Amino acid sequence: MRLLVGLGNPGAKYQGNRHNIGFMVLDEMARRHGFSPWRRRFQGETADGSIGGERVTLLKPLTYMNDSGRAVQDAASFFKLGLPDITVVHDEIELPAAKLRVKVGGGIAGHNGLRSISAHVGNDYRRVRIGVGHPGAKELVHGHVLNDFAKSERPWVEAMIEAIVEHAGLLVDGRDSTFQNKVHLALQAKGFLDNNDGSAA
């Protein structure tokens, strides 16, 4: 069994924020893969289903970003899951817009959602890091992640979500590098990434 966590803040005013791309991915994942309706539990919302023959629970913490770890800990404890069974999808300012990286463990790059999860369950869970770009100065980061994606960004955001959802079976199967490559190829094919460095076109 796998626990797939999408990070974000609850409420309509945060719905389109860069910080909420984890929620966006899970919403589309549940829709496309025919998961159960969302229900409230583990201090969040969950949907149950399967991807590639593997049982998967999707979790959107409703604790607000800074306390995401409480919901993850509750779910992991209930299902008796270890860190290798947990994958967290989140925005990443240290990556250019439209770039994706998968890694296990490592630093949190100032992400408060990851900080909370690491404090509650440990650090060695898988992260799907979705680049949203850096605003250029530290004092601008808060406003950057809590603002909606610009209209000009929406096409790549939609393409990114579609590619992640389409190739989710590879992620669930632990084939991280293949998953990462498939997502980047999908974005390149639509003209959103430069072929050389993977930055947004």
Swiss-Prot record:
Site positions per UniProt: Discriminates between blocked and unblocked aminoacyl-tRNA: N9
Entries under InterPro entries matching the protein: Pept_tRNA_hydro, Pept_tRNA_hydro_CS, Pept_tRNA_hydro_sf
Gene3D superfamilies: Peptidyl-tRNA hydrolase (3.40.50.1470)
GO terms, molecular function: peptidyl-tRNA hydrolase activity; tRNA binding
Active site: H19
Main function: Hydrolyzes ribosome-free peptidyl-tRNAs (with 1 or more amino acids incorporated), which drop off the ribosome during protein synthesis, or as a result of ribosome stalling.
Protein name from the UniProt record: Peptidyl-tRNA hydrolase
Organism: Rhodopseudomonas palustris (strain BisB18)
Gene coding for it: pth
